[in-house]
Each structure stands twice: as C-alpha cells, then as structure tokens.
Curated annotation (Swiss-Prot):
One of its GO terms (biological process) is regulation of DNA-templated transcription. Involved in late/very late gene activation. This is Late expression factor 11. Coiled coil: none annotated. It holds the Pfam family Baculo_LEF-11. Belongs to the baculoviridae LEF-11 family. Keywords: Transcription, Transcription regulation. InterPro entries: Baculo_LEF-11.
Length: 126
C-alpha cells in the first residue's frame, strides 16, 4: 500500500487539479498534520503563480505579508482533499479550526523552529 498523500488543489478551471505526493505518517487518517498544511500552502503558491496572482507568494506562513495566501486557502478550503493510503479522499474543510489556528500563530520562524526542535529533542540542538 502506498504511504503517500496527494493534495488536490482547485484551479480557475474546476476540472483541472494539481497533485503533490510526499510520504506522511498515516496512523490516523482523521488527523490533519501541519506538514499537510505546509503542502497545501506550497500548492496554493504554485496555483497563484500559474494564475499570475504573485503578490507576496514568497511569504512564509508565519510572516505578516502572507495574507493573500491565507485568504486563498480560507476561500477554497471546501474544495481541498487529502488522499492517503488509509483514506481515499479526506476533506480538508473538516479541519477548519485547526487550520485557522495554525494560520494565526503568533510566532516567527526562529520561535517556530525552536518549538519544533524542542518538541523532538527536549532541548534545542542547533
């Protein structure tokens, strides 16, 4: 069985979809991980670039100038799906509260990295 996740992203033409595959932990198909949100973020940027809506596409999720990307994700949340080995089509909109919380984190990149490293190693290791 394939342990990859595929993300279907909406385009201006509803019949076209872009997919992204990468390995993810599939122990709980109902859980929406931050890495899946980052993959949706990347695919959103690619979609915006293809439609020439390039304002602030360089922005990271935790930066202040990422509003256009966040707005696009919020507006199209009901159209996103995640496909994993355990779940053929998991709707992203069911995780709207988790996504909203993650998109509104009050951290910078250094704090986010320190938090991630501390979570894994119990103390920063850089």
């Amino acid at each position: 069985m394939n342990n990859c996740a595929t993300f279907s992203m909406p385009h201006s033409n509803a019949t076209n979809h872009t997919t992204l595959s990468h390995p993810v932990c599939n122990n709980n198909a109902n859980c929406f991980t931050r890495s899946e949100l980052y993959a949706i973020w990347s695919e959103t940027i690619n979609t915006l670039k293809r439609t020439f809506k390039i304002k602030n596409v360089h922005a990271h999720m935790l930066e202040d100038d990422s509003g256009e990307i966040k707005d696009y994700i919020r507006a199209n949340l009901s159209r996103f799906t995640v496909i994993t080995g355990k779940c053929s089509k998991r709707k992203v909109c069911h995780h709207d509260k988790r996504i909203a919380r993650t998109l509104h984190l009050e951290k910078n990149l250094v704090d986010e990295y320190a938090c991630s490293v501390t979570h894994v190693y119990s103390a920063p290791k850089w």
